[in-house]
């Protein structure tokens, strides 16, 4: 049950939001055992983000929570796909994207 959040200072159109959601759905499958059918996504544009002391640089913070554990190679492939996606869809340079992953040992869905 992965959860991916994208927070950026870039304005996101409806079509860009849909493209991001599709791309994140594809990228999450690079993590073993994860699929788009379990994925929840939060996309937030036009946030007040200061990067390198400036508010005029396109930047993004992507956080990902996953149940269980995956190896480093899977996460690296996921991160590469996500940074490419943000560059393609929102023109955010790779160096202006911060990503984190938290592995959650207990994840509750459907109240169980």
Locate the predicted segments by residue:
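Interaction-mediating elements
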Residues: 1-112
């Amino acid at each position: 049950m992965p959860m991916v959040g994208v927070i950026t200072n870039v304005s996101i159109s409806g079509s860009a939001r849909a493209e991001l959601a599709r791309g994140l759905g594809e990228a999450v499958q690079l993590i073993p055992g994860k699929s788009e059918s379990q994925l929840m996504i939060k996309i937030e544009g036009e946030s007040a983000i200061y990067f390198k002391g400036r508010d005029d640089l396109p930047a993004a913070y992507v956080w990902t929570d996953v149940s269980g554990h995956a190896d480093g190679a899977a996460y690296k492939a996921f991160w590469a796909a996500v940074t490419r996606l943000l560059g393609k869809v929102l023109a955010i340079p790779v160096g202006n994207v911060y990503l984190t992953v938290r592995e959650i040992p207990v994840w509750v869905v459907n109240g169980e």
